[in-house]
Curated annotation (Swiss-Prot):
Protein name stated in the entry: Small ribosomal subunit protein uS17
InterPro entries given in the database record: NA-bd_OB-fold, Ribosomal_uS17, Ribosomal_uS17_bact/chlr, Ribosomal_uS17_CS
Pfam families: Ribosomal_S17
A GO BP annotation: translation
Its biological purpose: One of the primary rRNA binding proteins, it binds specifically to the 5'-end of 16S ribosomal RNA.
Keywords: Ribonucleoprotein, Ribosomal protein, RNA-binding, rRNA-binding
Subunit composition and interactions: Part of the 30S ribosomal subunit.
Gene3D superfamilies according to UniProt: Nucleic acid-binding proteins
GO terms under cellular component: cytosolic small ribosomal subunit
Organism this protein belongs to: Dechloromonas aromatica (strain RCB)
Family: Belongs to the universal ribosomal protein uS17 family.
Molecular-function annotations in GO: rRNA binding; structural constituent of ribosome
Length: 88
C-alpha cells in the first residue's frame, strides 16, 4: 500500500460512558454553520472506542483514532488521555 493510505483520522472527545469492558463511549462535538441562516450550531456524535487498558474513565478528554473493526460497533481506538476528569 502507498503511504497516503496510512493516514488515520483522529478525533478529540469526552468520555461519557466507561461501563463496558475495554470499551468507552466518546462524545465528539463539532461546530457547523447553518447553510441558510449562518448561525453556528454544535453537532455531536457518539463513538464506541476500544480502550485496551481501561485507562480512560468517564469525563476524561481523549483522542481516538480510526482502526480496523474490532467489533460490530467499534472502529475507533483510544490513543491518549489528554485531560483527566476532576473527581469531586
Amino acid at each position: 500500500m502507498s503511504e497516503s493510505s496510512s493516514i488515520k483520522r483522529t478525533l478529540i472527545g469526552r468520555v461519557v460512558s466507561d461501563k463496558m469492558d475495554k470499551t468507552v463511549t466518546v462524545l465528539v462535538e463539532r461546530k457547523v454553520k447553518h447553510p441558510m441562516y449562518g448561525k453556528v450550531m454544535v453537532r455531536s456524535k457518539k463513538y464506541h472506542a476500544h480502550n485496551e487498558g481501561n485507562s480512560a474513565k468517564a469525563g476524561d478528554l481523549v483522542e481516538i483514532v480510526e482502526t480496523r473493526p474490532v467489533s460490530r460497533t467499534k472502529t475507533w481506538a483510544v490513543t491518549s488521555v489528554l485531560e483527566k476528569a476532576i473527581v469531586v
